[in-house]
Amino acid sequence: MTYFPSYDGIISMSQLQMSKWDLFEPYMEFIHRLMNYEAGPTQEEKEIIAAFCSLLNACDFCYGAHKNVCMAMGVDEELFPKLVDDIDTAPVDEKLKPVLRYVRKLTLTPDRMTDEDAKDCYRAGWSEEDLTIAITVCSSWNWFNRMILGHGIDRKWDEAVFRDRGAPEKMMAGYKAYYDEMIANGLADTSGPKNMAPPQV
């Protein structure tokens, strides 16, 4: 179960957000736009950033989900532990490495960011807009990770179920379509838990 008794049936970030859809729907529209935004890193690179930040935060749910999306795009799952070990020697595009160093530092030690971190990205050919998009992906997944871990949903993660539902391929096609399909198929309750009283403990 999660840390929230009335949320016991919720096993994913999607369902958590849909339980308060009046609050979270605009945010999910934003995430859909962000991950499909033409400027900045490619869709694959954004998914790599999402998975990498989630692994750094030890969020098994978000890491597993976005690692599988990356794998559906052709990324080797062994990339991510190699990125954690050493970005410089990891088998990833050289241009992306300063961005990955940037989001790693932003995730783990945000108070230590400097202008040199940004300049490393500019020297590699990234624009200010590109870096803003990368920062936004990093920041969004740090938020997702804390939502999952804070609610205790991470303990219910089942990677096989995620793959068997074809979720990685559906998310590649667009986050909004993925959420719309979940609602249409009854996989999420948008009315949400309504227990306003403190749980009995």
State the predicted function of each range.
Residues M1-V201:
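Hydrophobic alpha-helical segments
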